[in-house]
Swiss-Prot record:
It is a multi-pass membrane protein. This is Acetylcholine receptor subunit alpha. The chain crosses the membrane at residues 230-254, 262-280, 296-315, 428-446. Residues 1-20 form the signal peptide. The keyword Ion transport applies. Pfam families: Neur_chan_LBD, Neur_chan_memb. It comes from Gallus gallus. Upon acetylcholine binding, the AChR responds by an extensive change in conformation that affects all subunits and leads to opening of an ion-conducting channel across the plasma membrane. It catalyses: K(+)(in) = K(+)(out); Na(+)(in) = Na(+)(out).
């Protein structure tokens, strides 16, 4: 029994040792006269065929200002090296090995539209080498590719970005690159919280440059159509701006007599200014175009400032008096006679339109109270009775009081008319500002939202 255990241990330890010996001998034989600077072809006129596949893992960042898209990818490359073939039976049945990528010839694929200066693919990974000479190399890479970011419809925008891959020194007669598929592999793609992939495709291009008009250079360009998820900007930017606009409209619902109209207007303006300073970093700072959200914020700012200016006019109208302003007939006709009837302002108390009698006293006055006699005693204003100094002074005093009361009544009626005009303006502007707020919001965003809905 003990002998069996000893033999079992010996054979189990010998297995890995034999495998290591076979792989070591295989590697020594393969690379004894191998040169990694020579293309693996039998005839120098032959081309090495390289199959390229792009696997997109993660969309890391989209920099709208610098127009750089950062992605995490795996670049799968397959080709056949005729100098690295072997018979598995000669090496203990070893059919594949993994060797450092620096030890073999590799196609010098680079990202043409790289934006950070590092054009090469990561080298510090191993390749899978099969006994047929087929090599599979899938290095990971962080690509920073240039992409023309169009912010016109931000945050309801779509961006069409690309990655252009090709060999740096080999033309199409020396190395032929073929796409593994017309679409990149997104089987391991991790969804972004800001972007969603709408479409993605790859195309192979034959390019002839001016320096070499007879020699083609090949590249594979992958295009990605990305659509931004706007929920974050709707909740944190658009809805607050909309609420500021509605609050601005309600300034005209506040009674002018309260004295708080300007306080509320200035408070809204200051709050909006602070809010814009906080969120300005969320908006792409580029001068190529004004984004939708920038237009809406500008609309909101103009909306608030316009309300302040109009509020000043309304307050000025409310406090006008006949001693400073005379109401033009057209103002009376429009704001007292016409608009209240059109807008159904039935709850408004209109100013008195009764015209006081121009005569303070008739020529015949009743002086029964003065004479002490019962019943009316018609007395001519110029009768001898009225020539009595005491009576005359009393009548003059009464006339002065009556004229003063008439003047005060006229002033009060005129002031009431101005206040009524201001009240009509408030009601009218409340309706107008609410409509402008809704229509302005729809005018800025509705067209783009309808377009995106039609695109599906």
């Amino acid at each position: 029994m003990e002998l069996c255990r000893v033999l079992l241990l010996i054979f189990s330890a010998a297995g890995p040792a034999l495998c290591y010996e076979h792989e070591t001998r295989l590697v020594d034989d393969l690379f004894r006269e191998y040169s990694k600077v020579v293309r693996p072809v039998e005839n120098h006129r032959d081309a090495v065929v390289v199959t390229v596949g792009l696997q997109l893992i993660q969309l890391i960042n989209v920099d709208e200002v610098n127009q750089i898209v950062t992605t995490n990818v795996r670049l799968k490359q397959q080709w056949t090296d005729i100098n690295l073939k072997w018979n598995p039976d000669d090496y203990g049945g070893v059919k594949q090995i993994r060797i450092p990528s620096d030890d073999i010839w590799r196609p010098d694929l680079v990202l043409y539209n790289n934006a950070d200066g590092d054009f090469a693919i990561v080298k510090y990974t191993k390749v899978l080498l099969e006994h047929t000479g087929k090599i599979t190399w899938t290095p990971p890479a962080i690509f920073k590719s240039y992409c023309e970011i169009i912010v016109t419809y931000f945050p309801f925008d779509q961006q069409n970005c690309s990655m252009k891959l090709g060999t740096w020194t080999y033309d199409g007669t020396m190395v032929v690159i073929n796409p593994e598929s017309d679409r990149p592999d997104l089987s391991n793609f991790m969804e972004s919280g800001e972007w969603v992939m709408k479409d993605y495709r790859g195309w192979k291009h034959w390019v002839y440059y001016a320096c070499c008009p007879d020699t083609p250079y090949l590249d594979i360009t992958y295009h990605f159509l990305m659509q931004r998820l706007p929920l974050y900007f709707i909740v944190n930017v658009i809805i607050p701006c909309l609420l500021f606009s509605f609050l601005t409209g309600f300034v005209f619902y506040l009674p002018t007599d309260s004295g708080e109209k300007m306080t509320l207007s200035i408070s809204v303006l200051l709050s909006l200014t602070v809010f814009l300073l906080v969120i300005v970093e969320l908006i792409p700072s580029t001068s190529s175009a004004v984004p939708l959200i920038g237009k809406y914020m500008l609309f909101t700012m103009v909306f608030v400032i316009a309300s302040i200016i109009i509020t000043v006019i309304v307050i000025n109208t409310h406090h006008r008096s006949p001693s400073t302003h005379t109401m033009p007939p057209w103002v009376r006709k429009i704001f007292i006679d016409t608009i209240p009837n059109i807008m159904f302002f039935s709850t408004m108390k209109r100013p008195s339109r009764d015209k006081p009698d121009k005569k303070i006293f008739a020529e015949d006055i009743d002086i029964s109270e003065i004479s002490g006699k019962q019943g009316p005693v018609p007395v001519n204003f110029y009768s001898p009775l009225t020539k009595n100094p005491d009576v005359k002074n009393a009548i003059e005093g009464i006339k002065y009081i009556a004229e003063t009361m008439k003047s005060d009544q006229e002033s009060s009626n005129a002031a009431d008319e101005w206040k009524f005009v201001a009240m009509v303006l408030d009601h009218l502007l409340l309706v107008i500002f609410m409509l402008v707020c809704i229509i302005g919001t729809l005018a800025v965003f509705a067209g783009r939202l309808i377009e995106l809905n039609q695109q599906g």
